[in-house]
Amino acid sequence: EKSANEVGLKSDVIRYPDSVEEKTVLDKIYELNKDNSVSGILVQLPLPKHIDKQKVIEAILPSKDVDGFHPMNVGNLSSGYESSIPCTPLGCYLLIKKIEPNLNGKKAVIVGRSNLNGKPMTQLLLKENCTVTITHSKTKDLKGECLKGDIIVAAVGIPELVKGDWVKKDAIVID
């Protein structure tokens, strides 16, 4: 909220106790969907266990889905259409593009297959004509896969998983 205000954006934070009923959350989302003064909705994950995360995500209008988690936005991103993009992969992508504007033909290794980071990052790099290999913490010879990458993005929630000797000279690494 503070960061939004600092850059001139209006932001309202709606907090609920962990005991909140799913219906209460869904009703608020439906209300915000109808409100033309609301341009975006972001639901802080994880949700309490008794609330169906997918139901909540799907209740948000795709046009107001700040995180890019709605199935329509996920599908649009993977099909190359305009969509909301999750902020972490988008930030990584913009950083990579600042370092190397021409990604055409680069070999990218994504360590992580989550819907939040790994899969969207893969789609963004595929759109740039990278050859993308998706790996994860259980990949056999992860070091060998990483050594092939011109770009390595580690997004598995394990700090410093990618070691220095896993990276070839001049590779771009985001961990």
Segments (PLM) and residue ranges:
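Glycine-rich phosphate/diphosphate-binding loop of Rossmann-like nucleotide-binding domains
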Residues: 1-2, 18, 83-172
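Redox-cofactor binding/interface segments in oxidoreductases and associated redox assembly factors
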Residues: 40-43, 154, 175
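Short, surface-exposed acidic/glycine-rich loop or hinge patches that mediate macromolecular interfaces
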Residues: 16-19, 46, 50, 140
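Anion-binding alpha/beta catalytic cores of soluble intermediary-metabolism enzymes, centered on
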Residues: 42-107, 121
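Conserved strand-to-helix beginnings and helix N-cap segments that scaffold or border functional pockets
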Residues: 25-26, 53-54, 146, 164
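Short, hinge-like loop/turn segments at secondary-structure boundaries
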Residues: 30-31, 59-60, 150-153
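A short acidic, often aromatic-flanked loop/helix-cap motif at beta-alpha or helix-coil junctions
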Residues: 19-22, 76-77, 141
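N-terminal ligand-binding/catalytic initiation module
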Residues: 1-40
